[in-house]
Regions:
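Long, low-complexity intrinsically disordered regulatory regions enriched in P/S/T/G and acidic residues
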Residues: 2-28
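A short acidic, amphipathic alpha-helical/loop segment
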Residues: 177-181, 387, 402, 513
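A residue-level signal for conserved active-site and pocket-lining positions in enzyme catalytic cores
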Residues: 60, 167, 322, 518, ...
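Short alpha-helices
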Residues: 124, 202-246, 257-266
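Hydrophobic helix-and-loop "lid/oligomerization" segment in the mid-to-C-terminal part
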Residues: 25-27, 34-163, 185-186, 237-473, ...
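Mid-to-C-terminal polyanion-binding domains and interfaces
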Residues: 3-7, 100-107, 344-350, 354-389, ...
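Histidine/acidic-residue-rich, glycine-tolerant segments that coordinate divalent metal ions
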Residues: 169-223
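Histidine-centered active-site/metal-ligand motif
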Residues: 194-195, 395, 462, 550
Length: 618
């Protein structure tokens, strides 16, 4: 049984009471202890058998870790956790075809997606090919004008440029028409992907995708870069078998490329379990060596002076690489990650940093307008299960970010649409929309149903995120369909919303030893959430607004011990109002702990997720 399955089973065996009696927090959550009653004996057994502190045992057990799995969770290694790449369907065919390309010195084109996973996957393949003397042509489609995945014109261009082999990464599984163009023109294609697949697959040389329906590898949780890494491992093995190495021909330094795999794994928000934990743990270690010239330049451009963490990957480096695909040149990120020229890398890194600042400005302006419109919609119908709003002044590349913010703020699925400007004033034209959801509402399923019903030009996605294209003339019909499709799920999900708590603590117990202990169970991210602690009945001794949207506080316990904390984007929200309006009365405050370095001094602070007034709980 998998870790998530074990956790679900443990939770279902016994109903839990609200943690500290919090039934309705500032953000509208019921607080629950993450460690289910059925997991408490497992936590104790983990602690005793492996000789680790009880707190660490509780953190591990609460995340579904079994007693025998602890060593591989605390010290994940590629050797122990990566299976033979041949377990993936079509892997041996792909490896042989890549080896052929190397030995024949063929021209190879790499066609990637415009997000971080696509950029990292493209760079991985290009660096591997480059080691073997092949300078790959990287093609990243323009998000606005070409959209996701291969298109016939792009494929035809690559073939005309002389590509003897095209490798698609993080895309291609459902690109039937474009890839048929390659076959018609006599060029082989290898698809390396991780997106959900139909039973029918493109007619190409190989489709390496753990989420194709006939694949039984159990590796569906990998991102595209994770699959790409396994592919170059297999291709290296095939070349070794053919005797390609030796006599001065060295094997590629595969492990030194894991920094790219780690970056993609975190940014694509795939579960940090199993092999993904090894990818990220080892990849962060590689990144600390600053060997990748492009990543080093990006880290310097961002002004980072601390060792990289999963937070660094997801919230500092990832957005900068994505900025090129959102509002600039989509290929900038992939190019940066392949550079060997420090001057050129520094130039592109600065350009991406500038684009990221521009993206933030665009997002802020769009979000302000979207929040105002959404507030009116929710005030008119508090039970509205899905927010759908759009404008012809909004940027296609940023609608997904705004949708995420709306979903976070209003705790319901949202769809943000950027309408084309047709200049006619007739109300005609198409819009490109991005949807984000909450746990318990499968928004991808709803979008696919709307597309099947003929209400959308196209649409698809997965449970938590989806995309669509819709004619303005069909918007109201599509809106009504989608709202009714998610109404039941959204209502149930919002009423059952919980915030999971790992334990209670006071500032006196927060020290380096505790943080070191918590870090042992990392890296944290999707599928392995950062431990969240409650500081119960603490007084807010100091509070101020920071910038335009954040609240900084100092919490004090009954023993006079203190800790600083910050609540991001809390101004104008119930959380900010709670923190700023305690009137000297004690409140419960929940959040995660993080080391912070400022001015040469290191301290531990609380990243505040939620708060609750004990007097308002039943």
């Amino acid at each position: 049984m998998s870790a998530p399955a074990r956790r679900k089973a443990a939770i279902s065996t016994e109903e839990q009471a609200a943690y500290l009696g919090v039934e309705n927090s500032a953000r509208g959550f019921q607080w629950r202890e993450r460690l289910a009653p059925g997991q408490r004996n497992i936590a104790l057994a983990i602690s005793q058998r492996h000789g680790i502190p009880e707190l660490l045992g509780r953190v591990l057990a609460a995340r579904g870790v079994g007693i025998d799995e602890v060593p591989l969770v605390l010290e994940p290694t590629i050797k122990a956790l990566m299976p033979d790449p041949s377990v993936l369907q079509d892997m041996d065919v792909a490896a042989a075809r890549l080896a052929d390309a190397v030995q024949k010195h063929q021209n190879v084109a790499v066609f990637g997606d415009y997000d971080v996973d696509g950029a990292c996957s493209s760079a991985l393949m290009a660096r591997w090919l480059g080691h073997h003397g092949i300078r790959a042509r990287i093609y990243i489609p323009d998000r606005i004008f070409e959209g996701y995945g291969p298109n016939p014109a792009a494929i035809e261009t690559l073939v005309k440029e002389g590509a003897g082999l095209i490798v698609t990464v993080d895309c291609g599984t459902t690109s039937f028409e474009p890839l048929a163009v390659a076959r018609k023109l006599g060029t082989d294609v290898i698809v390396i992907d991780h997106h959900q697949a139909d039973e029918k697959l493109p007619d190409v040389a190989a489709v390496v995708n753990p989420n194709r329906q006939d694949d039984i590898s159990g590796l569906g949780h990998l991102c595209a870069a994770g699959v790409t890494f396994m592919t170059i491992v297999a291709a290296t093995r095939e070349l070794r078998r053919r005797g390609a190495y030796g006599n001065g021909a060295a094997e590629p330094p595969l492990l030194s490329m894991l920094d790219l795999v780690a970056l993609a794994t975190v940014c694509d928000v795939v579960p940090l379990q199993g092999l993904n934990r090894a990818y990220v743990t080892r990849g962060l270690a590689v990144m600390r060596q600053r060997e990748n010239i492009g990543l080093r330049a990006l880290i310097d451009a961002a002004g980072l002076n601390q060792p990289p963490t999963t937070y660094t990957l997801g919230f500092v480096l990832g957005p900068r690489i994505n900025a090129g695909g959102r509002i600039g040149d989509a290929a900038l990120g992939a190019r940066l990650l392949t550079f060997e020229d420090e001057t050129e890398a520094a130039r592109i890194a600065v350009q991406l940093d500038k684009l990221n600042r521009e993206r933030k400005s665009i997002e802020t302006e769009m979000l302000s307008a979207a929040l105002a419109e959404a507030e009116v919609m929710v005030d008119a119908d508090p039970a509205l299960p899905l927010l759908i709003l759009g404008s012809d002044t909004w940027h296609k590349g940023v609608v997904g970010l705004v949708s995420s913010r709306l979903t976070e703020r209003f705790r319901r699925p949202s769809c943000v649409i950027a309408w084309e400007k047709d200049g006619s004033g007739s109300g005609k034209g198409q819009g490109t929309g991005s949807l984000r959801s909450i746990t318990g509402v499968d928004i991808g399923k709803a979008v696919r149903a709307a597309a099947t019903a003929g209400l959308l030009v196209k649409g698809g996605g997965h449970a938590m995120a989806a995309g669509l294209t819709v004619e303005k003339s069909r918007l109201e019909a599509a809106r009504a369909f989608l709202i009714e499709n998610v109404r039941a799920e959204a209502g149930a999900a919002r009423s059952a919303a919980t915030l999971e708590i790992d334990g209670a603590i006071t500032p006196a117990g927060v020290n380096d030893k505790l943080i070191n202990l918590i870090e042992q169970a990392g890296p944290y991210g999707q599928g392995n959430p950062q431990p969240r602690f409650v500081f119960p009945a603490h007084r807010v001794k100091f509070a101020k607004v920071m910038g335009e949207a954040h609240v900084r506080v100092t919490l004090e316990a009954g023993d006079a011990s203190k800790i600083d904390g910050i609540a991001f984007r809390a101004i104008g929200q119930p959380l900010g109002e709670t923190l700023l309006g305690t009137g000297g009365m004690p409140i419960h405050v929940a959040g995660t702990l993080r080391r912070d370095s400022w001015g040469g001094r290191e301290k531990i602070e609380l990243m505040i997720d939620d708060a609750a007034d004990p007097r308002k709980q039943s």
